[in-house]
Amino acid sequence: MSRPAPWVKPMAELKRPLAEESPAGSDSSVEPLATGPASGGSRVGRAPGMVTRLLDRLNEQEIAYCRWQGDEHLQAETAAPQGLDILVDRQDALRVAVILAEAGFKRAVAAALLPDPGGEHHYLALEEDCGSIVQLHLRYNLAIGDERLSEYRLPWEPLVLSTRRLDQQAGMYVADPSVEFLFLLVQVAFDLRLGSLVRHRLGAPWCCPRRLREVHWRLRGDAGPVADLSRRLLGAAAADLVSEMVAGEPSFTKVREFRRCAVPVVHNYRLYRRGGARWRRSWRALCVVARNLSRGLARSRRPEGRMVPSGGVAIAFLGSDGSGKSTLLVETMAWLSGSLRTVPIYFGSGVGPSSVLRWPLLQAERLLRKRMPSVRDRPWRRSTGPTSSLRARLSRSLWAAARLVWAVALAYEKRGKLHALTRARNRGLVVVCDRYPQNQFPDFNDGPMLRSWRDHPWRLLRGLAEWEGAPYRWAEHVVPDLVLKLHVRPDVAQRRKPDMQLQELEKRAEAIRGLRFPDVTETVDIDAEEPLEQVVRRIRRCVWRKI
């Protein structure tokens, strides 16, 4: 039988305590980690209800876990903590997946990037009490690398889990400071690139990463346990440098020298060959460029947003003017875009985002409304009745021509937006629609405007009417997954929108109530007169069920 390589540490060696006085970590009587001015940002308060219940289930099932903040790229200098990071024994992966599903957590995957073998598993859950989304970053391996690719996988998971400590204030297990410091030091050292050396030679000050400074402060100059750990894992030369950095401050020169000492051991834990990591990183950089170029399709405040692996979701907000539709839509976008890639699509005919073809018409309308009071009623958007006077017939012909141009431009825009909705949903994105095309009420409320011309004696007008109605008929097949109907009494809507006529509001509210969708679409009626907080909470619950 072949002997193991000299750099492979036996499992018992990795699980050996760091020092005689170091606690085993699994005892609940262990003191919580100390806090101070330098580590105030690293302290985690009591976990939310969803996370607390999840941790209780893990403890009941005797699954070893610990909170792990070993990824500097998730916690940049100016970034706020994005959820909870935990490390779990990979032998319990199936049991953990079942527990997460029972606890209400849903899987999310990174957008526009290939799977990373050393990466994390991201889960999301809805906190029912406050309506916020809880993020959970689950890892089974300890991998190091930059934000695009993990290059090394350190087999130190048994050591981390066997030396964990119970943070009684946070109510969860955390990593031993000595283990966390050594891991962070290795990560920072192997993250140094040629650019880091050039900036250092040019005199640019090197700033020690925040998380490494926090763990360094918690060690309080006690280099004994971390030096012993470094000697066992990386060798005597690396241990001497670690002792100097714990007693003093991690500097660029010492970190670079530490890298030289650790290279013979750490390079044996590479995930790829020497050239493999380089071309994979280049390919991922191209993916990032492609993602940035497609930002028009997937507008999200966070470029590292997640997608739904089970398929995207389209959500449509319907409601008359004064129902609070715009306010609720903006709030929903802000709530979702912090965790998932979201795409807002405006299907209305007002002043919202429009196509290049309809934009000049909106500008012309804006100018005409200042000069002609009759334009405020937008006569080109409705059909006119018969008239006998020559002047009236001439005016009707002009408005009919304007109506034709407007209807064609609007149909062209809706056709493109329906294509965008289909592409985004097929890619796993969440699409939030302001209004939605309908084919049940012509000449009204996002319906076709030229249906009355389908029986016109002129063949050209019949063809235009047929072409204009195509996207509205297509919308009957490309239906949203969730339709939220916002209902409000016409008098309440008029108080919110004084410029609207009461009869018009009544007509629109009746049309919203009469809209019907296929069985595959979930339709929810919402009383928009309730307090905003209650309406928002109900909308969030409905949206979360569909994701």
Region spans (language model):
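Hydrophobic positions on the alpha1 helix immediately C-terminal to the Walker A/P-loop
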Residues: 328
